[in-house]
């Protein structure tokens, strides 16, 4: 009986240690992803100065929120006077729910890897200098509610993959250089037209069966 109890205690201790190691590995991976973002940014106001890669747990860093399992769920860097570009490593933050990087001077493209953020609820990248196309991979974000990409320099069509996100309530892509037609399917049926304004080559709303969505879009 004593030996049996000892084996149970050893098994329980082993399980606890395994879970702790898994969480430590996750924290390291998320910390590496955030540090990659820090390296890509110019930060004159030292907003991300606390993002020290020698600290194992990124939950101690300013502007980073974690859940009870020490997994990164929110990144708040809106209106922080940041410039630079986004990095594909952000796609490793699989528990992230809110990515807030609005009102900065961030340039370059939106990484397609953001489509891996399966828990994402809000993607706020408005008022930056982002270029390139809206990644079709964002259509994989099945929990997304808010998508605000307005006031950038994005080009190309609005990806039709976004029309299958049933949770999507707010889409704003105004003030870009998008082309093609405005979708009317799925959640886009209820998006106000002003959220598509100031895209000189964007036409719509789309006439289903009559107009190609990439009309006038090269």
UniProtKB/Swiss-Prot annotation:
Q: Where is the signal peptide?
A: 1-27
What Pfam families does the entry give? Answer: LRR_14 (PF23598), LRRNT_2 (PF08263)
Q: Which keywords does this chain's UniProt record carry? A: Leucine-rich repeat, Plant defense, Repeat, Signal
- Coiled-coil ranges per UniProt: none
Give one GO biological process term: defense response
**Each LRR repeat, start to end:** 69-93, 94-117, 119-141, 142-165, 167-190
Q: What does this protein do?
A: Probably involved in plant defense response.
Name of the protein this chain belongs to = Leucine-rich repeat protein 2
Annotated source species: Arabidopsis thaliana (Mouse-ear cress)
Upper lineage ranks?
A: Eukaryota, Viridiplantae, Streptophyta, Embryophyta, Tracheophyta
Tell me what gene encodes this.
LRR2
């Amino acid at each position: 009986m004593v030996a049996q109890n000892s084996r149970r205690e050893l098994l329980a201790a082993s399980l606890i240690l395994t879970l702790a190691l898994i969480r430590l590995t996750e924290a390291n991976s998320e910390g590496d992803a955030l540090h990659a973002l820090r390296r890509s940014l110019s930060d004159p106001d030292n907003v991300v100065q606390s993002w020290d890669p020698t600290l194992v747990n990124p939950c101690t860093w300013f502007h980073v929120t974690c859940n009870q399992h020490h997994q990164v769920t929110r990144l708040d860097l809106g209106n922080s006077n940041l410039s630079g570009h986004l990095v594909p490593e952000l796609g490793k933050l699989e528990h992230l729910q809110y990515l807030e990087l609005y009102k900065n001077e961030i340039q370059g493209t939106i990484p397609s890897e953001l489509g891996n953020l399966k828990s994402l609820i809000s993607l706020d990248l408005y008022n930056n200098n982002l270029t390139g196309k809206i990644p079709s991979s964002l259509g994989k974000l099945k929990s997304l509610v808010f998508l605000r990409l307005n006031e950038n320099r994005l080009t190309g069509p609005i990806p039709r993959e976004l029309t299958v996100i049933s949770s999507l309530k707010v889409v704003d892509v105004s003030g870009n250089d998008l082309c093609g037609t405005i979708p009317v399917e799925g959640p886009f049926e209820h998006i106000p037209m002003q959220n598509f304004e100031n895209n000189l080559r964007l036409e719509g709303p789309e006439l289903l069966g009559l107009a190609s969505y990439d009309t006038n879009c090269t």
